[in-house]
């Protein structure tokens, strides 16, 4: 296997594993984690009290991994750009995220878009330019999706 491909697989696997390890503790303080789970030493189910992942099975990934893989698929598709460089179309990405959230809602998931991404996409839905709507966020959603960009 090409070492670059192996490294890409490793980076994405590491992202998914870290996400699955953190899934049951999203938005919980250290004290809450200790009270609900005690010491976590491996993959565990999301507790019923977990606000974003109640009852999610151990090893499940969250919106962070799903959206990173969405970025990866769009980057792969963008390799056919006329410049020969990797390209990620902002409009296509915005619409893909909207479709992703709609599918999550249909499945009954509580693990949806974060507030900054949601606010930006609501502006896209209202007809604003996707290249100008994301500058006011205060959350870390973009950092959760950046791994494929580093690989590209």
Language-model region placement:
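Structured, active/binding-site neighborhoods that engage oxygen-rich ligands
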Residues: 1-152
């Amino acid at each position: 296997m090409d070492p670059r491909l192996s490294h890409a697989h490793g980076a994405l696997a590491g992202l998914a594993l870290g996400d699955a390890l953190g899934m049951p503790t999203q938005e919980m303080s250290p004290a809450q984690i200790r009270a609900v789970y005690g010491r976590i030493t491996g993959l565990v189910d999301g507790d019923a009290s977990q606000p974003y992942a109640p009852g999610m099975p151990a090893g499940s990934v969250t919106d962070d991994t799903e959206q990173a893989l969405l970025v990866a698929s769009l980057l792969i598709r963008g390799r056919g750009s006329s410049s020969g460089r990797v390209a990620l179309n902002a409009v296509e990405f915005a619409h893909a995220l909207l479709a992703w959230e709609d599918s999550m809602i249909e499945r009954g998931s509580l693990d949806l878009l974060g507030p900054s991404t949601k606010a930006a996409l609501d502006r896209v839905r209202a007809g604003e330019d996707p290249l100008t709507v994301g500058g006011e966020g205060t959350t870390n959603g973009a950092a959760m999706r950046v791994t494929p960009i580093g690989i590209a």
